[in-house]
A protein has these predicted regions:
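Sec/Tat signal peptide C-region and signal peptidase I cleavage site
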Residues: 17-23
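GH16 jelly-roll
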Residues: 24-281
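Positively charged n-region of N-terminal signal peptides that target proteins for export
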Residues: 1-4
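General helical structural elements
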Residues: 6-7, 116
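Bacterial N-terminal signal peptides
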Residues: 7-16
């Protein structure tokens, strides 16, 4: 009897420990409903000087004049329009998580998305981002960028307390398909490395420029200026009237952000030693 009780106690301990070290879901959204939920997401505030409401040739929608993006058929529809009712520029979207994600033992991001346009000169972004405290240029960032100019691959980039600019770019081809197809994009952000995956295939690992501060998650779409020649197209210009407006979009099927469980023996940290079950029967 004592042996049975001892075994039950050990099993309970093992189950409890496995629960403690299991990855935790921090944000999940499959975008069911008619619009993106304000309990999970927001767009920039125009009055904030650090909100980045203008990038390239694009002004992002902001809370004072726009609603959150629509959802359709289980997808968030992230749009950029050629007509901007408030200025002569493109009118884009920068959807941001309400949460900020601290590195801890690691963060794992999984996004299923596709671009709905092949018109050259448009960029769709899937990324983590944060300006450094007190700065408007130094920042941390880990990203996937989908360029309609280069539809058969995706640009990856990373910054660690670096100025806005070129960063540390690596362009990777898709294992199959193009930006017009749904793909699963993953970022695994560890304390000592960052890995990018597409459709389960490892496409890049970075061990040098690894950010450590908390970051917010973004989904955006915008039109760059000539300062980014690989992504810019001089033939794509803002519309001068609502009647000539064009709408371009990225569909996001789901977002899943979770913590990464602490390392195990495979990464050099020894697990709890196995327990010897002794027969305690008198």
């Amino acid at each position: 009897m004592r042996k049975v009780l001892f075994c039950i106690a050990i099993c309970f301990l093992v189950i409890s420990l496995s629960t403690i070290i299991r990855a935790e879901t921090l944000l999940y959204d499959d975008f069911c409903g008619n619009s993106v939920s304000s309990s999970k997401w927001h767009i920039p505030t125009w009055v904030s000087p650090t909100d980045g409401t203008v990038v390239g040739l694009t002004q992002f929608r902001f809370t004072q004049s726009s609603a959150l993006p629509a959802a359709d058929n289980g997808n968030a529809i992230i749009v950029v329009e050629s007509y901007n009712p408030t200025a002569f520029s493109f009118y884009g979207t920068d959807l941001r998580s309400n949460q900020s994600f601290a590195l801890g033992t690691g963060i794992h991001i999984t996004v299923r998305a596709k671009m709905n346009t092949t018109t050259p000169g448009i960029v769709g972004g899937i990324f983590l981002y944060a300006l450094k405290p007190g700065s408007t240029t130094y920042h941390d960032e880990i990203d996937f960028e989908l360029l309609t100019n280069l539809p058969n691959g995706v640009q990856t980039n990373i910054y660690s307390n670096e100025k806005l600019g070129t960063g540390n770019v690596q362009f990777v081809p898709y294992p199959s398909g193009s930006i017009s197809d749904y793909h699963t994009y993953e970022i695994k952000w560890h304390p000592n490395r960052v890995s990018w995956f597409i459709d389960g295939h490892l496409v890049r690992t970075e061990t040098v420029h690894v950010p450590t501060g908390p970051m917010t998650f973004h989904l955006n779409i915008w039109v760059p200026d000539p300062g980014w020649p690989a992504a810019h197209d001089p033939n794509l210009k803002p519309a001068t009237s609502a009647s000539s407006n064009q709408i371009f979009s990225m569909s996001v099927d789901s977002v899943h952000i979770q913590s990464i469980a602490p390392p195990t023996e495979a990464s050099g940290v020894a697990p709890i030693p196995p327990l010897q079950l002794l027969d305690k029967t008198p």
